């Protein structure tokens, strides 16, 4: 039987670490990247999406890219890459995600920011979860989240989709070393404008990508998780589907993975 590469959908933004994550995904041969959407975790969705389109085009590729219509401007909005003869999908990100998922039949999602686009797809389409195999996501400090963001996280944790999660406190120690930064810019000079502002930002997207492709390199704690909205904490419960929360990874193997894609 012929091996079929998994279908991957990415929901992210365009900070320096996000841009690296996207570049890694575009250069990977382990999966089929079917589309991307821009969330609102750094730049506005519009600005992030335009940069994502530009980076994708810069690589000589054309992929489905959508933005969030419920958008807000951000002080971080900046044009780094410009799209040439390519445009956003003419629908909201959550609708585009649903269309791609239903077309593919089975899909994995990697989310390196807020969960709004994914949660809205869950709310608007009853059969959305039927098409999603796994979600790889970051669990941020819940004290910093709005009630709406907490509700989005709780919905995903209760959806029945298999969730693999990395806690923000775990991810914060994974940063780009200066020698690797220099090597990446040397090998990919088009990334210099973005990476010159890199300042020890955790490599969240890259970690999630590695998690999606090499889960055997990680050790997990398995538990059903529920948001306590009053205390803004996660509670372990038996009534929820088990999520897989990362508590250990071979750091050297992660950096080897990153360097193999970006530095070699």
Predicted regions located by residue number:
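N-terminal acidic, glycine/proline-rich low-complexity segments
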Residues: 1-264
């Amino acid at each position: 039987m012929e091996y079929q590469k998994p279908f991957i959908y990415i929901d992210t933004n365009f900070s320096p670490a996000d841009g690296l994550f996207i570049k890694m995904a575009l250069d990977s041969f382990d999966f089929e990247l079917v589309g991307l959407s821009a969330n609102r975790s750094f730049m506005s969705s519009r600005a992030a999406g335009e940069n994502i389109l530009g980076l994708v085009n810069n690589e000589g590729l054309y992929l489905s890219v959508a933005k969030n219509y419920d958008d807000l401007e951000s002080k971080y909005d900046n044009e780094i890459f410009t799209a040439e003869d390519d445009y956003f999908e003419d629908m909201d990100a959550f609708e585009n995600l649903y269309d791609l998922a239903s077309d593919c039949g089975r899909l994995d999602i990697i989310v390196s920011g807020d969960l709004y686009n994914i949660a809205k797809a869950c709310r608007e389409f009853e059969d959305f979860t039927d098409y999603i195999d796994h979600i790889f996501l970051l669990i941020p400090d819940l004290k910093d989240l709005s009630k709406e963001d907490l509700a989005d996280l709780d919905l995903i944790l209760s959806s029945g989709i298999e969730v693999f999660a990395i806690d923000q406190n775990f991810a914060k120690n994974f940063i780009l070393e200066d020698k690797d930064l220099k090597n990446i810019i040397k090998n990919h000079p088009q990334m210099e404008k973005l990476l010159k502002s890199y300042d020890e930002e955790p490599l969240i997207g890259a970690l999630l990508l590695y998690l999606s492709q090499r889960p055997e390199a990680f050790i997990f704690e398995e538990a059903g998780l529920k948001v306590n909205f009053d205390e803004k904490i996660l509670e372990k419960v038996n009534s929820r589907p088990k999520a897989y929360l990362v508590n250990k990874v071979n750091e050297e193997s992660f950096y080897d993975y990153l360097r193999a894609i970006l530095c070699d």
